[in-house]
């Protein structure tokens, strides 16, 4: 289970979804749970997504 605190700690620099997945849960091949968490965090304004580079950042 991926937690918000772990995601925020992994976002020490802007990262793409797949590289975040490799840092947080490399054994899980599906990015669905992480993507769902990132979207909820984006709604809460904790993270931002740069559409041009495809990377997630801390807000």
Predicted regions and their residues:
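Short, hydrophobic-biased segments on the C-terminal half of alpha helices
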Residues: 35-39
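Glycine-centered, phosphate/nucleic-acid-interacting loop/turn motifs that mediate DNA/RNA or nucleotide
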Residues: 45
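Short capping segments at the starts of secondary-structure elements
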Residues: 10-19
């Amino acid at each position: 289970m991926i937690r918000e605190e772990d995601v925020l700690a992994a976002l020490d620099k802007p990262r793409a979804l797949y590289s975040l997945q490799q840092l947080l849960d490399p054994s899980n091949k599906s990015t669905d749970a992480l993507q769902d968490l990132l979207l909820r965090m984006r709604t809460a304004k904790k993270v931002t997504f740069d559409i041009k580079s495809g990377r997630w950042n801390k807000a």
